Amino acid sequence: MSTEFFWRLPLGTDGPQLSTDRHNRGNPHHRPGNIAPGRLPNGDSDGFTYIDYIAQVAKAAELAGFEGALLPTGPEPWIAAAALARETRRLRFLIAFQATWTLPAYAAQQAAILQHLSHGRLDWNIITGGNPASQRAQGDFLDHDQRYQRTGEFLDIIQGLWNNERFSYNGNIYRLENGALPPHLGNERKPGVYFSGFSDPALDVAARHADVYLNWAEPVEQLKPHIERVRELADKQGRTVRFGLRVDLFARETEDAAWRDLRRQFDKLDGKPSTLSKAFTSTSDSVGGARQTAYHQNIQRFDDLIIGPNLWAGFAKAKPGPTVGLVGSHENIAERLAEYRDAGFSTFILAGNPHLEEALRIGQEVLPLVRQAPVASLPLTASA
């Protein structure tokens, strides 16, 4: 099975440090960055907006050999993807998307149109929401299990619309009568479904609908039993599921340089998590998020966050998102990624600050090493 690599696009903000609380390159809300302020000497805007910066990151990822880019939750990833499709030629866009944001029939039509305009470069990172406070702020008052039920029904309808000229559905949350895609869009490729979640309701949805089941990084041996369970559940559905890994990287020329620079940045946090990270972890009901939090909760010493070869569990102390990341030389990082690949992972969603420069560096220095490394074992995938 071939390996695919995605690069995360920093839709929120970006900067040279793990934490962007102090140093950043602006954000989509037109806050000027304190690194590249976007101002002319007379104080006027230079007309360069944050989406222009994101476009540079996307072009860098494409140039560096990444197959696609993740557009995480943030200021409307759909619109950003439509803009970036005009700036790139082959880069696929993995759009983070929640069922609560729109009705499934309309989402299917939106996806088909974007597939048509981008020549089939759209995939979905279907998320269900792991922060009840954030969900309520969007008008979503369903509990954890109900949200996954909605996601499952949402994907039932998407599948039905794509596979039938007319489709009706009668679920607990959604109903549809004689729905259809516009005739001229019916032949567009259905977006691939990249899905994650550790709870039982999440695994049920994954078994029925996921093309790629995503995990946050943990020690390989900790992930193997969980992957095996997903494989068995998918097999009962007669489906094949591939496995993916989301992981932040901190790569330098040498391993010593990587750990030294990371320690320096960690010390600047003064033992305090970033504002966004603290708000994210304190209100989450995500089972997968709880697994990540357990690796760093109540741990303040840098060395105590080292949980395996080149594995460090302190990334979430600087920013929201994955806790465990890879730290080391380009060769170290490539070796660890190859180990995950040999354990059955064929999709990798990578990231590193600053995203523009690191896309080029990782693409040039790390990806070729992973692609050239011999496969040590057969991939662990669900078989039809």
Task: Annotate each predicted stretch with a short phrase.
Residues 3-9, 68-71, 92-97, 122-126, ...:
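Hydrophobic faces of well-ordered beta-strands that scaffold small-molecule active sites
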Residues 10-12, 74, 98-100, 127-129, ...:
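Active-site beta-loop-alpha junctions enriched in small/polar residues
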Residues 47, 52-72, 205-213, 339-346:
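Catalytic domains of carbohydrate-active enzymes, especially glycoside hydrolases
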Residues 78-98, 150-152, 235-239, 243, ...:
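Alpha-helix-loop-beta-strand connector modules within alpha/beta enzyme cores
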Residues 101-116:
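Glycine-rich anion/phosphate-binding loops
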